[in-house]
Amino acid sequence: MLAIVDVGNTNIKFTLYVDGEFSESWYISTYHERTASELYAILRVLASQANINIHHLVGAAVSSVFPAVNGSITEMFKSFFNIVPVFITSAHASLLGINICLAQNTIGSDRLADIVAARTLYPDRDLLVIDMGTITVFNLVNKNGDLYGQVLSPGLACLVKSVRLCTAALPQVCVNKPTTKVISDATASSLESGLYWGYLSMVEGVIQRILKEESGKSLQTVATGGASNFFRDTTHVLSIDKLLTTKGILQIYRKLIENEEGR
């Protein structure tokens, strides 16, 4: 049993990989003061509720864009499972056939995982890989594995949080799929509608502009990330794979282990 850990700015996603299949997934809010003992206690309870013996773990692969919790995650696996977790970084890109052709020669490990998994799903294709997380990231990758362009914008969670922080009288809302009717006569539902449809329109609009700029290419578009599943039934522009990042982390982990064993 392998633990695949995706540490984002908002949530830590723990996924178990058992007998060749992705099993349970659990989400814990990302918080920089979480200790190893606290993380272990939460995992143990979640695993117990699912009738899983978490101590059957034999390895751990971690992608993290929130460095403040890396120490606690490492300590948890070492202290409670006797496992040294494998952390994925953009330094592994060349090993995986990815060339980072950006002004900054580094990207988040989650983006690398997304790209690796997308290239496996769609080999020999020019790709537009979108991660709809805390920040929405549009990655442009050609069939040779060159990451040559990007667009970054606020994610849905950022937009919801900005309403709370920047207004005094508006209600706090959770964005779920509204009705197909966009217009509402109630404040809360109209705010939910604006956030939901406004965010989706932004994503679809950016995609259309990218496709126009890259008109000479036949881009395969694939999306993942925490917010992506909310839009599965309301857009035909996106091919959504909610496990894309998790699949990529697993692929990179296997490559790193294989490379280490081959030395």
Swiss-Prot record:
Recorded metabolic or biological pathway in which this protein acts: Cofactor biosynthesis; coenzyme A biosynthesis; CoA from (R)-pantothenate: step 1/5
Residues the record lists as binding substrate: 108-111, 187
Keywords: ATP-binding, Coenzyme A biosynthesis, Cytoplasm, Kinase, Metal-binding, Nucleotide-binding, Potassium, Transferase
Cofactor requirements of the protein: NH4(+); K(+)
Catalysis performed (reactions): (R)-pantothenate + ATP = (R)-4'-phosphopantothenate + ADP + H(+)
InterPro entries, sorted: ATPase_NBD, Type_III_PanK
Top EC class, one word: transferase
Pfam families registered for this protein in UniProt: Pan_kinase
Co-factor remark: A monovalent cation. Ammonium or potassium.
Subcellular location: Cytoplasm
Binding site for ATP: 6-13, 134
Catalytic residues of the enzyme: 110
GO biological process: coenzyme A biosynthetic process
Keyword Cytoplasm annotated: yes
Superkingdom of source: Bacteria
Described function: Catalyzes the phosphorylation of pantothenate (Pan), the first step in CoA biosynthesis.
Record-linked PANTHER family: TYPE III PANTOTHENATE KINASE
Subunit field text: Homodimer.
Name of protein: Type III pantothenate kinase
Gene name of this polypeptide: coaX
